[in-house]
Amino acid sequence: MFPLSLVQPSHSPLCPCSQPALTLWPATRLIFGHLEDDILSMRNDMERRMQRVNEACRLLSKDTEMRRITDQNRQSRESEGTSPNSGKDGKDHFELTLNVRDFSPHELTVKTQGRRVIVTGKHERKSDTEDGNYFHEYREWKREAELPESVNPEQVVCSLSKNGHLHIQAPRLALPPAPETPIPISMDTAPRDAQELPPDAQTSNAEGDQKVD
C-alpha cells in the first residue's frame, strides 16, 4: 500500500486560517430592517395626514352645504309673505307670518318694543372632530314689523306651526265712530275782482290811484 502522504492532494488551501470569513448578509438584513421601519413610519404618517385632509374636506363640504341651505331659506323667506297679513277683510285682526324653520323654539325670541314687534333667532353649535379639531357654527336672524295704530301691543300672541312658520296675531281695536261735527264757513271780505287780478295788476292799479289824487 501507498503511504497516506502520497494520496493526499499536492495543493493546499489558499487561506489556511481557522476563523470564518465575514459575509454581507447580516449588514444587509439590518439595513433592510431599518428601511422597512422607515417606510412603515412614513405610511402611518401619510395615513394620519390623509385622515386630517378628509376631515377638513368633510367639514368644508358640510359648512358649504349649510351656507347654501341658509341662503335658500333666506331667499324663500324674502319671497314668501313676511309682511303683515290681515284677516278676511283686514278689519278683525293683525297677522304676521314668518318662516323660522332653521331655528328650534328655544332659539327664538319674540318681543314688543313700543309699537314694533321684534323676532330674533340665534343658533349656536360646538363640536369636536375625531382628529382633535374644533367646529363652531353660529347663525343669527332678526325681523321687525310696525304694529298698526288699531292694535294694542299688549294683546299680541304668537304660535309656531309644525312646518316652521311663526304666526304673530293681535286683535284690532274697535275704534269709536267719529262724531258729527259741523264745520263753519268763513266769509272773505276782500272784493272778488281784486282776488282774481294778479299781484302786478293790483300794484299798477294802486299806483294809478295815487297819481290821480
Swiss-Prot record:
Keywords: Stress response. GO terms for cellular component: cytoplasm; nucleus. Gene3D superfamilies: 2.60.40.790. One of its GO terms (biological process) is protein refolding. Pfam families: HSP20. InterPro entries: A-crystallin/Hsp20_dom, Alpha-crystallin/sHSP_animal, HSP20-like_chaperone. Residues 76-188 form the sHSP domain. Residues 61-80 have a biased composition (Basic and acidic residues). PROSITE patterns: SHSP (PS01031). Residues 61-93, 174-213 are annotated as: Disordered. GO terms for molecular function: unfolded protein binding. Belongs to the small heat shock protein (HSP20) family. This is Heat shock protein 30C. It comes from Xenopus laevis.
